Amino acid sequence: MFKNIYQDKRVLITGHTGFKGSWLCAWLLDLGAKVAGYSVDVPTKPSHFEALALANRIEHFQGDVRNKDSLRQTVDRFCPEIVFHLAAQPLVRKSYEDPALTFETNFTGTLNLLECLRNQPSILAAVLVTSDKCYENVEWLWGYRENDRLGGKDPYSASKACAELISKAYMESFFKEKGPNIATARAGNVIGGGDWAFDRIIPDCIRAWSEKKSVAIRNPNATRPWQHVLEPLSGYLTLGQKLYSENSVCKNQS
């Protein structure tokens, strides 16, 4: 799978303690990669990261992507060949409660990571994960396309659009002729085992039903696509493989 490209490769994952990040750690370990992770904390109790005892199976670095010096020191210490950037403030409701934190994490955190990519010669490929909510929401019935307008009517969505813009600027300004091949990936809502986060429809339903309570749906009139967590992760891994092995121009993949 993935042409054995990850075997013995040094792979850094930001946001590795989260739902998708912990699944990505486990998959990369199974592929034979040497994995390191950088995250501010374990976001839920219980957590998929702790259930898999990943802190004992990878190089586990605790730090905030908003702290550029801490992130740079981690990158310089581990010297990764491939990077997956998943660290984020991922919740729309929290983005209303703390918009500054959301922009600092999702935009400035991405900027700090891009600076590491620019200055660490060991890195040959990087996948920067954003969101399908980076598009301007015009309430049409079909899926958004690569050439649709970026936007965001809430702080979370706008922060992801900002992350896309800064990533594109670095691609065009610094990585066209030298440096790592990088791409962004825009996934939608994910479901699957190991997700204990709040403001996620399936965990919220299970918690409410187990306590014989009604389920509080944040926006019952919304329509959103869902995919199993392993589907976008397979896309990230395929994209990372192509960026690393083929020096391809796989820019802004959704």
Positions of predicted regions on the chain:
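N-terminal Rossmann-like NAD(P)+-binding domain of SDR-like oxidoreductases, especially those catalyzing
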Residues: 1-187, 234, 240
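A structure-centric signal for secondary-structure junctions around beta-strands
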Residues: 8, 123, 179, 212-214, ...
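C-terminal structured domain segments across diverse proteins
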Residues: 146-148, 159, 182, 187, ...
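Glycine-rich "substrate-gating" loop/helix at the edge of Rossmann-like oxidoreductase active sites
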Residues: 153-156, 187-199, 219-231
